[in-house]
Every structure is written in C-alpha cells, then in structure tokens.
C-alpha cells in the first residue's frame, strides 16, 4: 500500500475515534444507556406557591465572598420572584424569572454587571425549573440519569436509586460540563441545602435553609 494511502487510512481512523469520543457527553460517558422510562421529570423543590423559600446565602467569586439572604417565591404558574438581601435586610438584587422571560426589578450598582446578571439568570432558571422534558436515560448502580435538551445545552438529572430523590443537575454543552446544582434533602419535597458550582469560572453559590 502506498505511503499516501496508509497516511489517509490513519487519518480516517483517528477522525472516527475522535468523532466517536465526542458523540457521548463526558457527563454520562461512564453510564449505560437504557430504555426511556419517563418523558417528563418534575422537580418539587421550589414548586409550592404557598411557600416562601428562604435561605442563608454565601456567594464566592474569585476568592471574594458575599453573604446574605436568598428568597424565592412562586408568584404564578410560570414565574418566580427572587430577592437577595444583606443580613440586615438591605435589598441587593430583585429578579422575576420564568422559562422564557427575565426581568431585573432592581440591583445595586456594584453588582450591575452584564456577565454576572447573565450567569445568575442561567443559574436561577435551572434552579427554579419545575418540569424537564426527557429524551434519553442512563444509569449505573446508584443513579438513574435523565437527559433533557435545552437549546444548545443539555441538562442531566441525577436521581438516586437508594434515596429516591433528585440529588444533582448537571448543565453542559454538547461535550462537557458547565455547572452543577447539588441538592441535599430529607423528604424529596424541600431542599435543605443547595450548591451551585461552576466549572469554567470561580463561582460557587451555597444556600442553607433559614430556620427562623
């Protein structure tokens, strides 16, 4: 076989391997694909309109910490209102967020940065989302994982087989993880603690239930 043909063969093999490796998202590359058992996954944690969800909040950005109170309230079937205040009650941010809309009611000038607002919009929309349409399912010994497409992103919902509750949501591009939500809950209805951890930027948000 001529050297040029051998080279082309090697290149084609390498391309096949690369394309195959890219076709499976790294989030679920170690999980087995299984037949789809449900097409809708409902998240209960922020869905009760009669409840004010109040948490102590700690936001860490590139080594800088901001602490305060996070309040989320479902104000109608599609929309949540989100307020972040200092521990003394001074309002820092006030948003209204739904599946398709995002409205900034108020924000202090120190936090009024487009990149921060866009990041928080994506974080909070995923946090407060109640219903996910499921296209694929994966599993291992401990979890069922449900994949839900969301525009040019994918959301992976990790449901514990042992505890029978949603413990994590990973948001990713088509190939790699972008950020994750981690839920700690005792009753599968209310999350006592929530963490939002980003992979590409040094941003971590920690919510702990405020017991008055």
What residue spans do the PLM features occupy?
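Bacterial signal peptide processing site
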Residues: 23-26
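Gly/Pro-enriched, hydrophobic low-complexity segments
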Residues: 142-212
């Amino acid at each position: 076989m001529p050297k040029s043909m051998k080279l082309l063969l090697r290149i084609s093999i390498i391309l096949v391997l690369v394309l195959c490796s890219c076709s499976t998202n790294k989030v679920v590359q170690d999980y087995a694909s299984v037949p789809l058992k449900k097409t809708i996954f409902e998240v209960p944690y922020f869905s009760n309109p009669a409840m004010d969800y109040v948490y102590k909040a700690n936001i860490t950005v590139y080594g800088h910490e901001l602490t305060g109170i996070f309040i989320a309230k479902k104000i109608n079937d599609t929309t949540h209102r989100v307020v972040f205040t200092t521990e003394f009650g001074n309002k820092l941010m006030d948003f209204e967020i739904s599946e398709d809309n995002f409205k900034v009611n108020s924000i202090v000038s120190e936090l009024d940065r487009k990149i921060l607002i866009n990041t928080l919009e994506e974080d909070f929309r995923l946090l407060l989302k109640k219903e996910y349409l499921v296209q694929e399912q994966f599993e291992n010994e401990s979890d069922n994982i449900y994949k839900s497409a969301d525009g040019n992103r994918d959301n992976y919902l990790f449901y514990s087989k042992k505890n029978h509750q949603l413990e994590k949501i990973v948001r990713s591009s088509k190939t790699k993880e972008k950020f994750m939500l981690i839920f700690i809950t005792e009753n599968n209805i209310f999350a006592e603690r929530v963490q939002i951890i980003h992979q590409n930027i040094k941003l971590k948000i920690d919510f702990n239930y405020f017991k008055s």
